Amino acid sequence: MVVKTKNPENGWSDPIKLQFEGIDPSLFFDDNGKAYVVHNDAPAKANERYSGHRVIKIWDYDVENDKVVPGTDRIIVNGGVNIEEKPIWIEAPHIYKKDGRYYLMCAEGGTGGWHSEVIFVSDHPKGPYLPANNNPILTQRYFPANRADKVDWAGHADLVEGPDGKYYGVFLGIRPNEKNRVNTGRETFILPVDWSGTFPVFENGLIPMKPTLKMPSGVENQTGKNGYLPSGNFVFKDDFSDKTLDLRWIGLRGPREDFVDMTDKGLRIIPFTSNINEVKPTSTLFYRQQHNQFTAAATMEYKPKNEKDFAGITCYQNERYHYVFGITKKGKDYYLILQRTEKGQASVLGEVKIETEKPVTLQVTANGDDY
């Protein structure tokens, strides 16, 4: 889909559905006024050679009418750099024009230890594209899995020219904990890119990477200021006294505004009948985990009416894997319960009878894989 505006601060259109299948669409506007869309797609069933076989397609794009031009689609990458090696999940394509030539950069290898970034070149936006002889230009696949403080699964990248005239690449990666679990999820990283030769190369993109907080030259570090979210070590405290909810709080499968009410006493959550075990919108505010070591706490006033009512805090991977720590009712009594859901099966780890006349503070502390 496409949404558009003349002012990025407001006036965005309703989503415009583009008529093709696949994932990761990217628009390219050429300097001659023409435009194109590239995206990942599955090959025709009769042409699928192995599991994970995917293609990159390109379409002419009608800017005036916000649609792809029917019948203009063409496969410009089949499988990946070398289909004979059965590469998987070629995706996330972007086209760049430099010195009169067209460069197609894609992710290859799938979200995991074989993830990488590869690049192709052509004299025409619709190909044919030839792969660089130094592919991949970014990956962590060749290094020991047990290396310390690692960044892994590097790929799914994009390029930008910075205010210093140099190129930089942003890409996705992970910072797994000591048991190789990815509780912080996929995150965005940045590296300088050397494009002094024919092809761009991520500097340090082919050596073992470690997370740092260096900023590109010429860029002011506004982390935690002027609306930018903090990074590194920090304390975030929200008493919900503002009339507008902080953007760091997010909803799941639906807008948070559907269940939050900012009152003079703080935040009031209007509960849905669904819960976090279901694949439905839930009346839950989430804060994305940014650290492998952290402490988080919430203070609430809550008096459940029956055994179906439950409120508290959660450490949430998805609807099948999570912890909940909160208050419910059994008979005439109120209980504080710690419950774990694993593979969709819930089990109570502990419970204690409590009074609900005063506010209750719930806290979780994480240290690597221990919560």
Task: State where each predicted segment sits.
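Carbohydrate-active catalytic/glycan-binding domains of CAZyme proteins
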Residues: 1-371
